[in-house]
Curated annotation (Swiss-Prot):
The protein's name: Sterol uptake control protein 2
Species assigned in the record: Candida albicans (strain SC5314 / ATCC MYA-2876)
InterPro entries: Fun_TF, Zn2-C6_fun-type_DNA-bd_sf, Zn2-C6_fungal_TF, Zn2Cys6_DnaBD
Membrane-spanning intervals of the chain: none
SMART domains per the UniProt record, alphabetical: GAL4
Subcellular compartments: Nucleus
Described function: Transcription factor involved in the regulation of ergosterol biosynthetic genes such as ERG2 and ERG11 through direct binding to sterol response elements (SREs) in the promoters. Also binds to its own promoter on 2 cis-acting elements to promote autoregulation. Regulates sterol uptake across the plasma membrane. Acts as a major regulator of ascorbic acid-induced response. Plays a role in the triggering of pyroptosis, an inflammasome-mediated programmed cell death pathway in macrophages, allowing macrophages escaping.
Phenotype of null mutants: Shows increased susceptibility to the azole drugs ketoconazole, itraconazole, and fluconazole; drugs that act on ergosterol biosynthesis such as terbinafine, fenpropimorph, and lovastatin; as well as malachite green. Leads to lower ergosterol levels. Decreases pyroptosis but has little effect on filamentation in the macrophage.
Length: 712
């Protein structure tokens, strides 16, 4: 009986199974199978997700129906929909994707292994796709931990996007479009895992234009990487590399090159998804300025100087990143800008610390000092306010002269600029010495302007010999600067009509020829024989102390000096008088200079008459012209008569307050040598036959062996 039951049981079971199977077949034909819940299987079924949902639904972790402008969930619950605060760029990108019928990207969660803490850290690093939902095991930790930006964003980006789970066209586009936007492109050469981008592009079967990367890279290694990218992008075959092998190889490379770092969402990636590579190539690179010097990339010129710092000055750091304490101010003109923005030292220098002191001095010159020069009657307003500053950017010696003069004016109200004045003045003199050896039409106006500015600066800084200020000059320093200016003016004379100073600067003695010719014609009209009678000029005497020297004979060695002095008295209130009166000592002819040096009493009396005119003018104008204050303070009231061994030139130095400091006439030549080391221009200086004048060209008596200068 028992055997019968055991035999029937399988049969009954089989019959029941068959019946059940038949019933299931009928049911399958009529009704769909029931969905298996997650609780029954222990696993969540993967489904398609979209990134285009509103931020409010994302925070609530509910599915968004993506209705715009307000989604259905937010409308139903009366919540503030994230679409209302979405940037316009994201809205346009979403509409563009819908128009192109592009399916939303898929994201898959990675399985988190709980074998060890190291594997947890590794899996966290691999989640590099922006805005990926963190693993449930780490979601709470990420909320509590502060966000630490990676030391190299390019490394973190590449290591994540090269993972096996992120091999899709969207992520490849993310990587490509953001390579040119990342600042630290210099680290491309050190990223070995980027070399696998060729395999990545091939696996994704995405034709990528990486030509814009080649123009952004400087190093040969980085250029080679870009070349490999270009070669791989053109490939059409897929390498036999599985996702698992690719994942393991990139993990090994990432572990050897950089430590694991927490995943940091990069919000800029979403906006860059639909940005074309052509637009990225036109964007300026946001590169970090490198502390390299400008001098190393600019060829050395004759007008350059080694530095831009002022020892002892309260100035900011060097505008091009240098901090040498021994260097002098440097302004290098005509710098060529390289095509590559990353290798452009000018761009990097401009982004580094600027020399605010020099900028302040230039602003002070254009806003204040230039108007004082015009107010003193020295040429036109536009020349000093507009033309001269523009020329200064082309000629460093003029720039240093302007900055020195501006610092002198500013030092009257602010302290701590003495060393700055000295540095700029020294560089201006040094660069002028080089520039006068190569005079041409392009630098003529700059030379004239620089010479005039240095004259005014020396007048402003004239001081007593006991002064200890670094910016102070000897009381007679203006004479040497005038001599240097006369050297320059003589060398560039006559000025062409194209010169800015053609109508305003006049140091010629053209009207002296008219005076002498008038005297000759008057004698001829009276029937006086030239060979048997002495000729006199019609020069007027304006100083009773030298009245006995009038009338002046045509063959008098004092004729030219007295004629120029007479001209000064007549033109005292003309616009350019300030230049004429201070240029007088520099334009003395050689014959009168010889008499003065030998101690000729009449020559010294003429110089004393000039001195009285000079002091009277400076005393009258010192309150109106600020740079006359210095020289007006050092000019004594009375000049006692010198005679004998003191020497005429020493007398000239003494009444200016600088006599005791100069004990040898060779020191004067040494000062002039600063402007003319070779001596080629000195031969032209203070030479009657080479004065910037029409005198010698109009009068035959000044030429040849029969000239009146050679008459005995």
């Amino acid at each position: 009986m028992m055997m019968t039951v055991k035999q029937e049981s399988p049969n009954s079971t089989l019959n029941t199974s068959e019946f059940s199977s038949d019933e299931n077949l009928k049911t399958n034909n009529s009704e769909p199978p029931k969905k298996v819940s997650k609780s029954s299987t222990g696993k969540r079924k993967y489904h398609q997700k979209s990134r285009n949902g509103c931020s409010t639904c994302k925070k609530r972790r509910v599915k968004c129906d993506e209705q715009r402008p307000v989604c259905g969930n937010c409308t139903k619950l009366k919540l503030d929909c994230g679409y209302l605060h979405e940037p316009l760029e994201n809205i346009l990108n979403t509409k563009k994707d819908i128009a192109n019928n592009e399916p939303p990207s898929k994201k898959r969660k990675r399985k988190v292994s709980t074998v060890s803490a190291a594997s947890d850290s590794e899996s966290t690093t691999q989640q590099a796709t922006p805005s990926l939902t963190p693993s449930p095991n780490h979601s709470q930790d990420i909320k509590t931990q502060p966000v630490i930006p990676p030391t190299n964003p390019l490394s973190a980006l590449s290591s994540g996007l090269l993972s096996a789970g992120n091999l899709n066209n969207l992520n490849v586009a993310h990587l490509v479009n953001n390579l040119s936007g990342l600042g630290d492109l210099s680290n491309l050469a050190s990223l070995g895992n980027l070399a696998s981008l060729s395999n990545l592009a091939s696996l994704a079967q995405l034709p990528i234009d990486l030509s814009n990367l080649g123009s952004l890279l400087d190093s040969p290694a980085a250029s080679n990487i870009a070349a490999s990218f270009l070669g791989s992008a053109a490939a059409t075959t897929v390498p036999p590399t599985t996702n698992s092998e690719f994942k393991e190889s990139n993990q090994r490379k990432s572990q050897t090159q950089m430590p694991p770092q927490p995943t940091v969402p990069i919000t800029s990636m979403g906006a860059a998804t639909t940005t074309s590579s052509h637009q990225q190539a036109n964007m300026p690179s946001r590169s970090k300025p490198q502390p390299e010097t400008l001098q190393s990339s600019i060829p050395a010129t004759t007008s350059g100087s080694p530095g831009m710092s002022y020892p002892g000055c309260p100035s900011n750091s060097d505008p091009f990143g240098r901090s040498s304490d021994k260097s002098l101010p440097n302004i290098s003109p005509n710098m060529s800008i390289p095509a590559n923005p990353l290798s452009d030292p000018l761009t990097q220098g401009m982004r580094s610390n600027l020399n605010m002191l020099d900028l302040k001095l230039m602003f002070h010159y254009t806003s204040v000092v230039a108007n004082t020069i015009t107010g003193a009657g020295i040429s036109d307003t536009n020349i000093w306010n507009c033309d001269i500053p523009k020329l200064a950017f082309e000629h460093p010696f003029l720039m240093h002269s302007i900055l020195a003069f501006s610092a002198t004016h500013l030092s009257r109200t602010e302290k701590g600029l003495d060393q700055c004045v000295t540095c700029h003045r020294g560089d201006a003199l040094r660069l002028l010495r080089e520039a006068v050896l190569n005079i041409n039409a392009d630098n003529t106006d700059a030379l004239v302007a620089s010479a005039l500015i240095l004259i005014m600066d020396s007048l402003a800084n004239a001081s007593f010999p006991s002064s200890t200020s670094p910016k102070s000059l000897p009381a007679s320093a203006w004479i040497f600067h005038v001599k240097g200016a006369a050297t320059i003016l003589t060398a560039v004379w006559p000025l062409t009509e194209a010169s800015r100073f053609y109508k305003f600067i006049s140091v010629d003695l053209g009207d002296l020829g008219d005076i002498i010719n008038q005297g000759v014609n008057m004698n001829k009209s009276k029937g006086i024989d030239r060979e048997n009678s002495a000729y006199y000029t019609d020069l007027e005497c304006h100083d009773a102390d030298i009245a006995d020297l009038f009338p002046v004979l045509l063959d008098s060695p004092y004729l030219i000096t007295l004629a120029y002095l007479n001209k000064l008295h007549k033109e005292r209130y003309k616009s350019d008088f300030i230049l004429r009166i201070f240029a007088f000592p520099a334009l003395l002819d050689k014959q009168f200079m010889g008499l003065l040096m030998s101690g000729d009493v009449k020559a010294m009396r003429i110089m004393r008459s000039y001195y009285k005119l000079l002091r009277s003018f400076t005393t009258e104008m010192k309150d109106k012209v600020w740079f006359l204050e210095g020289v007006s303070q050092v000019l004594p009231v009375n000049v006692e008569e010198y005679a004998g061994g003191a020497g005429g030139m020493h007398m000239m130095m003494d009444f200016l307050g600088g006599g005791p400091a100069i004990v040898d006439d060779n020191e004067i030549d040494a000062e002039i040598t600063k402007f003319d080391p070779s001596g080629t221009l000195t031969n032209k200086l203070i030479d009657t036959d080479n004065l910037p004048s029409v005198l010698t060209s109009n009068l035959d008596l000044m030429q040849g062996d029969n000239g009146f200068m050679n008459m005995k």
